[in-house]
């Protein structure tokens, strides 16, 4: 086997391990908080195979209820079909759905346009970017290993989005700066901070009580978004007051400091003079 072919096979297997198909129930549990955002909008799901994607399923079956304008879905093409499951196609395609046409209020095969792409359907490709430009809101589960690059593209094209990522992404410099600048925030999240995803390439180490056949349990996953939600406006009940003697307090310029416990988030920070008045 040549070095080039060997690398392609390794990359293909690696790409397969980066695919986590999301449960319909998890999508529904999160999306119920965002319904007001979707009326008259074009939704783009660009990292889930539209032929098996629960994102496409959710939006197509709720198209009229949400008042969508258009639904588009694309996915990355198999580079070597023999390495992949029957869910993968040798050619990359995108699906376009413009709503119910025959009065059944359910998406049917003849109502969904299937268009073959010239390229591989990668979200970074020129074809995918042209589809992205049409979109108002992007909703999907992007590859965790490409999360920084994926979010960067959404910000570059000024798109609204609701996507799944690992909580470790918060520590990435690029993502942290977006959170700090109030350009991205966390959604409502998965129950218990863990999600079950369809992926046969990993062994499932979940406990017997938390095990689901054909799925892998992934801890620390979360929804990331720039869509406004009620959760962002909930008041935190704070009690702790800090003094300069206790530790360095944040300045008006937003200097951060360490808080060891959730309950120790500062109600306020006082100068020596201000503290003496309490």
What are these regions (language model features)?
Residues 1-278:
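Class I S-adenosyl-L-methionine-dependent methyltransferase catalytic core
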